[in-house]
From Swiss-Prot:
Antimicrobial peptide. Has activity against Gram-positive and -negative bacteria, and fungi. Has little hemolytic activity on red blood cells. Keywords: Amphibian defense peptide, Antibiotic, Antimicrobial, Cleavage on pair of basic residues, Cytolysis, Disulfide bond, Hemolysis, Secreted, Signal. Residues 1-22 form the signal peptide. It is found in: Secreted. It comes from Nidirana pleuraden (Yunnan pond frog). The keyword Iron-sulfur does not apply. One of its GO terms (biological process) is defense response to bacterium. Residues 23-43 form a propeptide. This is Pleurain-A3.
Amino acid sequence: MFTLKKTLLLLFFLGTISISLCKQARDADEDDGRKMTEEEVKRSIITMTREAKLPQLWKQIACRLYNTC
């Protein structure tokens, strides 16, 4: 009976450790997915400003070409 208790306690302990390690690894993976690097942030800002200014730029060019301003 003593060996059975000892074995069950060992299995419980090892199971708890493995679950804890899996949770830590999963949390680390989720953190990597959410955080953007500084370079990615710069790229996204440049892209957003480019997309926002491009239609306005085309309107200004068309306005000057056709003198409709």
